[in-house]
């Protein structure tokens, strides 16, 4: 066995600063959405370089409210990738629109921009590019298609905090961008999300929709500055962030780039150790992007090894190395097959990657010894299965 203790696929990186800020919030008696939420939004807006940043309880909420704010509705179509988490497709369905999947590029595992135009119909209203693992999509091509066909671009950046495309931070390119602060993400608030946009009208609509459709700043009604009177001006949702979550986010954001760089260091070691090893396929990184390295997706070349991906994961677990898989393509799930008629074989590239992908541990709390343990475990399994 390579190591004695189990190395989990992820661990959140929470410091004393976050803990002390949460304690301060709890002692303040203001624990729901309030001043610290607004502070976190301001810090995030400045970090990304967007005009507006609206905090929410998840990235899913951000994607959903983006669709609502842009009036995506019944019988509309939204183009996205099948190689993503369920949230990306589900929010489209919540609007009674149809998710139209486009297969992925076999190098970056992002949506294949060369196939997008073929999927456009008179019902198409938006494109949701997903920056898989933290590698930005080809946004210039996507924006050109969107301009040519008068479509919105709603970026799913759940994996991509800190990523850049041709020198532009992800979060400053599309009509809206949604980020995730789930426990496994590059920064965390436990649960949480943020939408960025440069469009004031969209920003104001999302702010109202996130809290039941109550008129703006109604959260202040419980403070000395507020009034008991409010009006419901939209049929909104309960999607707001709390000051407890924001307290964590304030300090997570301050070290976001330090944590991204540690992820990058780990990815570099993996790449150097695995890229010339027969039986493995390492991630491709385009020269014009800065990778966020939320995931390290290693592909097992099942044509060169006597072991499949599932068995490889089991062998890693025997060596006390935890892993995950990202993702089961959406078109293979029962709901999407039954509701939209998708079937196995519809998106061969997504299926090809899925059958081979293993997400190796990559997070700031990993020590160099942890990283070497992963490397040695992978090499051991490869050598035993040639």
UniProtKB/Swiss-Prot annotation:
One Pfam family from the record: DegT_DnrJ_EryC1
Keywords of this entry: Pyridoxal phosphate
Cofactor(s) required for function per UniProt: pyridoxal 5'-phosphate
Gene3D superfamilies the UniProt entry points to: Aspartate Aminotransferase, domain 1, Type I PLP-dependent aspartate aminotransferase-like (Major domain)
Gene Ontology process terms (BP): polysaccharide biosynthetic process
TM segment ranges: none
InterPro entries: DegT/StrS_aminotransferase, PseC, PyrdxlP-dep_Trfase, PyrdxlP-dep_Trfase_major, PyrdxlP-dep_Trfase_small
GO molecular function, one term: pyridoxal phosphate binding
UniProt KW Nucleotide-binding keyword: no
The family this protein is said to belong to: Belongs to the DegT/DnrJ/EryC1 family.
Name recorded for this polypeptide: Uncharacterized protein MJ1066
Organism: Methanocaldococcus jannaschii (strain ATCC 43067 / DSM 2661 / JAL-1 / JCM 10045 / NBRC 100440) (Methanococcus jannaschii)
